[in-house]
Swiss-Prot record:
TM regions (residue ranges): none
Locations listed in the record: Cytoplasm
Gene Ontology CC entries for this record: cytoplasm
Organism (species): Pectobacterium carotovorum subsp. carotovorum (strain PC1)
Catalytic activity field: cytidine(1402) in 16S rRNA + S-adenosyl-L-methionine = N(4)-methylcytidine(1402) in 16S rRNA + S-adenosyl-L-homocysteine + H(+)
Name the UniProt record assigns to this protein: Ribosomal RNA small subunit methyltransferase H
Residues annotated for S-adenosyl-L-methionine binding in this entry: G35, G36, H37, D55, F79, D101, Q108
Assigned keywords, A-Z: Cytoplasm, Methyltransferase, rRNA processing, S-adenosyl-L-methionine, Transferase
One GO BP: rRNA base methylation
EC number(s) stated in the UniProt entry for this protein: 2.1.1.199
Length: 314
């Protein structure tokens, strides 16, 4: 079933090039997906190199079985636990690069049975790992209208959040929704105005998915984990797909790139400043966006943003 869903890796070469691969280095692909980035990293590693992949989606773990390479291993779990995985392997502070490709993957969106898409009818699930936590249907059934409003506004910036939340609660009182098509049609009916070229359920589905999977909290923990595992001069390469994700990545790199707060004019060397604490990363280059050619070939790439940072010596 996995092969039925094509996945085109976004910003493939750019994201891996930003890791500055060393042939004998140790790298982490924190979001294996269908292995596009992992395969390219492996192609650039020498026999002594090593790649650890992470994914919480059971289908991604199944897809990883196709990689028969002694340099490669994968862990089934959230990338937010990266620091713990690396500590168990005794590799804390020895990782030469971490790559994170955030958000939902094309196979997840395109498989109606996963319940992520408002364009294809399927069970109203939306979990990255269907074996854990509440499904979207279960959460919507028990949630109060105010809670739904908060989720739609916070994670989807949905201006008709109150109307949609009220419609969801009223519908679930009479006949609980269990299908994505039911929710998409309800949202469309509750939205008095439509954005041009955008389905009215786009923002709400994004918001519910982010909430169900604790995506933003997972990103924050993953970034902190990456910082703790990287070796000096180790690279962080992060692809985000919407403003909420990119804002977290941008703020994290900016915060970790700040020097210590000391009075101006003190005669301190760069090494002495770092010893005061506060500066652990430096941004590398400018953010990258996909080319027009890539967007034409893969329209889902259009909103992607790629940022890099480098670990500074302690």
């Amino acid at each position: 079933m996995l092969e039925n869903y094509k996945h085109t890796t976004v910003l493939l070469d750019e994201a891996v090039n930003g890791l500055n691969i060393r042939s004998g280095g140790i790298y982490i692909d924190g979001t294996f997906g269908r292995g596009g980035h992992s395969r390219l990293i492996l192609s650039q590693l020498g026999p002594e190199g090593r790649l650890l992949a992470i994914d919480r989606d059971p289908q991604a773990i199944e897809a990883a079985k196709a990689i028969d390479d002694p340099r490669f291993s994968i862990i089934h779990g959230p990338f937010s636990a990266m620091a713990e995985y690396v500590a168990e392997l005794g590799l804390t502070g020895q990782i030469d690069g971490v790559l994170l490709d955030l958000g939902v993957s094309s196979p997840q969106l395109d498989d109606p049975e996963r319940g992520f898409s408002f364009m294809r009818d399927g069970p109203l699930d939306m979990r990255m790992d269907p074996t854990r936590g509440l499904s979207a249907a279960e959460w919507l059934m028990k949630a109060e209208a105010d809670d739904i409003v908060w989720v739609l506004k916070t994670f989807g910036e949905e201006r008709f959040a109150k109307r949609i939340a009220r419609a969801i609660v009223e519908r679930n009182r009479t006949e609980p929704m269990t299908r994505t098509k039911e929710l998409a049609e309800l949202i469309a009916a509750a939205s008095p105005v439509r954005e041009k070229h955008k389905h009215p359920a786009t923002r709400s589905f994004q918001a519910i998915r982010i909430y169900i999977n604790s995506e933003l909290e997972e990103i924050e923990r993953a970034l902190e984990g990456a910082l703790s595992v990287l070796a000096p001069q180790g690279r962080l390469s992060v692809i985000s797909f919407h403003s909420l994700e990119d804002r977290i990545v941008k703020r994290f790199i900016r915060h970790q790139s700040r020097g210590p707060q000391v009075p101006a004019g003190l005669p301190l060397t760069e090494e002495q400043l770092r010893s005061q604490g506060g500066q652990t990363l430096k941004a590398v280059g400018k953010k990258l966006m996909p080319s027009e050619a890539e967007v034409a070939e893969n329209p889902r790439a259009r909103s992607s943003v790629l940022r890099f940072a480098e670990r500074l010596p302690a």
